Amino acid sequence: KTAATAAAAGAVAPYVVTGFPAVHAADPVTLRIAGTGVNAFNELAQKAKEDLGFNIQYITLTSDDVVKRAVTQPNSFDMLDSEYWMLAKIVPSGNLLGMDAKKIKAYDKIVPIFTKGTLPNGKAMSRQGTAPIKVAYLEEQKSKKFAAEPSQWMTVLPTVYNADTLGIRPDLSKRPITTWADLLSSEFKGKSAILNIPSIGIMDAAMVCEAMGEVKYGDKGNMTKEEIDKTIAVLTQAKKDGQFRAFWKEFNESVNLMASGEVVIQSMWSPAVTAVRQRGVPCVYQPLKEGYRAWASGLGLPSHLSGKQLDAAYEFINWYLSGWA
């Protein structure tokens, strides 16, 4: 899921780095970071090497494969770039090491969405879906359970967050798009697309079904069997009716579908909208009256990490929050 344009979760005063490059040059360290590639920037790796003296190696995977790798091959990476929805699948494996909040220099400056479950103005955040605060902390450093209240042990250090909506081709839609329900409007039969990453796409589907008045959810992130059945029934019928041009799973698929005009309205991520515009094609990330589907990601530590690798991971995390990234 992508957000090169997402806001940094902890922009703080510059982090002064002294002496580290020389130390690590004598005893080379490489941190292998597994993730979707959303935050895998070569410029970031180069700057980290200049400032910290060790190598960053990205392992780019699909969202589903990030979860599979974290659960089945935790020794194959040194840091995990995980989206928050993935944590409910990963933490029960015991493969995630609680991150010591006391070692995070800018901990007190992290946006309270992640540390208190509130907006900066103190207003409580929605608890629907995978609200970050519900999966932000572990009971202990080595635990398979989330803490009910903030603890010393963080699951991941939040790095980026954003809110997704529908992308549209305003030159082809022929009318204003105002609601999630428009994704299944008969006007766009054969010209709509939805995200085919189940844990995310089902939330887009829920936004659509509720906007249509087909389903009223108690909690979209913890649906009842009846709610699931109703949601799937709506999608199945739409597919039978030929509503969907495609079900996309990868960033570039969504860009190509929209840029080519094969799709007029679809689930989309903000950098994909930018990529379409860069081709000279009009594309709008459309605000909708029901609101957005929010998401976030962060850096976590696999349970096997220790010694200089663990020390380097904390150095990188503190550097990441220092402002340059």
Feature-to-residue mapping (PLM):
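N-terminal export signals
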Residues: 1-19
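Early extracytoplasmic/lumenal segment of secretory-pathway proteins
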Residues: 26-93, 255
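Extracytoplasmic ligand-binding site segments that recognize negatively charged/polar headgroups
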Residues: 39-42, 91-253
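Extracytoplasmic/periplasmic substrate-binding proteins
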Residues: 243-305
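Short beta-strand-to-loop elements that line the ligand-binding cleft
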Residues: 55-62, 81, 223, 242-251, ...
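Bilobed periplasmic-binding protein/Venus flytrap-like ligand-binding cleft at the lobe interface
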Residues: 179-188, 298-325
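A bilobed periplasmic-binding-protein/Venus flytrap-type ligand-binding module shared by bacterial periplasmic
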Residues: 165-172, 208, 296-309
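Alpha-to-beta junction loops
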Residues: 54, 73-81, 95-97, 188-191, ...
